[in-house]
């Protein structure tokens, strides 16, 4: 699952991927999971020693679900929830989930690039997605398609998405 959040913890876009994309209640379940990770996002973002946008592992929910975070210089947040069900972790993995610290960096960079391309679109109005304007989610087909491509293309060990 991939989530984009820009302002006041208002999710701009949430994408679910198989096997959860067709599961009843999965959207709500992952929304709760992301909401539980927002405080950790805030704590990591306030770290004055942070020199990178990659916030790393935010929350290991159990042995299979983990939430990873990335925050841009403008405060846009990206979260990826990994479900490692059925995947074997390699030896020496820092997280114990088969994903090493920094392995999601290509996916986050691709998401940030997709979001920048969305902002460059003259027909996209970012202010209509604020909480004051009703908190609408991003409906741009190009952005949604690119997020889906990124989510399906990324696997542990992939260096370019």
Please place each PLM-identified region on the residue numbering:
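Acidic, low-complexity cytosolic segments
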Residues: 14-161
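Fungi-biased regulatory scaffold/adaptor regions
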Residues: 1-14
């Amino acid at each position: 699952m991939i989530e984009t959040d820009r302002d006041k913890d208002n999710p701009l876009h949430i994408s679910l991927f198989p096997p959860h994309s067709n599961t009843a209640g999965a959207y709500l379940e992952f929304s709760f999971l992301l909401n539980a990770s927002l405080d950790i996002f805030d704590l990591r973002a306030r770290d004055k020693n942070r020199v990178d946008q990659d916030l790393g592992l935010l929350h290991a929910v159990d042995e299979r679900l983990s939430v990873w975070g990335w925050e841009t210089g403008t405060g846009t947040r990206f979260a990826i929830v990994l479900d490692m069900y059925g995947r074997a972790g390699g030896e020496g993995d820092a997280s114990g989930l088969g994903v090493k610290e920094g392995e999601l960096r290509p996916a986050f960079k691709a998401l940030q690039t997709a979001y920048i391309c969305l902002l460059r679109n003259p027909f996209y109005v970012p202010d209509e997605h604020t909480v004051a304007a009703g908190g609408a989610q991003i409906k741009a087909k190009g952005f949604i398609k690119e997020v889906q491509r990124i989510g399906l293309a990324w696997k542990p060990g992939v260096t370019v998405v």
